[in-house]
Regions:
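Conserved alpha/beta-hydrolase
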Residues: 1-10
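Active-site nucleophile elbow and catalytic-triad environment of alpha/beta-hydrolase enzymes
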Residues: 113-130, 136
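Short beta-strand/loop motif that positions the catalytic acidic residue
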Residues: 133-134, 140-142, 146
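Gly/Ala-rich beta-loop-alpha elbow adjacent to hydrolase catalytic centers
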Residues: 43-47, 51
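Short alpha-helix in the alpha/beta-hydrolase fold that links the catalytic acid
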Residues: 136, 150-159
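Active-site nucleophile loop of the alpha/beta-hydrolase fold
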Residues: 64-74
Length: 166
């Protein structure tokens, strides 16, 4: 099963609230925890943000996150412009920033779903407030060549979680 609003259309993505994403991952981890003795949660990008949220809520044994996008490279646009315009301009054409070969492996939408991006911003703000609740051993992976996530996210996470092993 896909995360609500994902893997279908920009319109589906735009129609989804961040609370639906939280409910989905909570329900799935609760099901998994009934079958497992230990829980290791791994997430990349938005999945990393959702993994952080889960680790703030559930007794996770180990957490691995990569390229979390709690703060965006285009922070001003995401934090101030998108909340103002997302109801009027619901999608924006993507500018291809990847090389030809890298783009062939990319399977996302051709447009940024701006209403969903605004929900992602809300998810990030909510998750940042919960970082102190994370106590499990945590590995954070971030590439210096990352084109989407800023490296300051590493410090944001590692300086705010309560884990002794990071």
């Amino acid at each position: 099963r896909n995360l609500p609003g994902h893997g279908t259309t920009v319109e589906d993505c735009n129609a989804t609230k961040y609370t639906e994403w939280l409910s989905f991952v909570e329900e799935n981890l609760a099901e998994l925890s009934a079958e497992c003795d230990e829980l290791y949660v791994v997430g990349l990008s938005m999945g990393g943000v959702l993994a952080l949220y889960l680790a703030s809520l559930f007794p996770i044994n180990k957490l691995i996150v990569g390229a979390t996008v709690l703060n965006f490279k285009e922070a001003f646009k995401v934090n101030y412009i998108v909340p103002l315009v997302n109801r009027f301009i619901v999608k924006q054409k993507k500018v291809k920033k990847f090389t030809k070969n890298k783009h062939k492996r990319y399977s996302g939408y051709d447009y940024y779903p701006l209403m969903a991006l605004n929900e992602f911003r809300k998810l990030n703000n909510y998750t940042i407030k919960r970082l102190k609740l994370i106590k499990c051993p945590t590995l954070y992976i971030h590439s210096k060549a990352d084109q989407l996530s800023v490296s300051s996210n590493v410090d944001l996470v590692l300086n705010n979680i309560s884990s002794e092993v990071k």
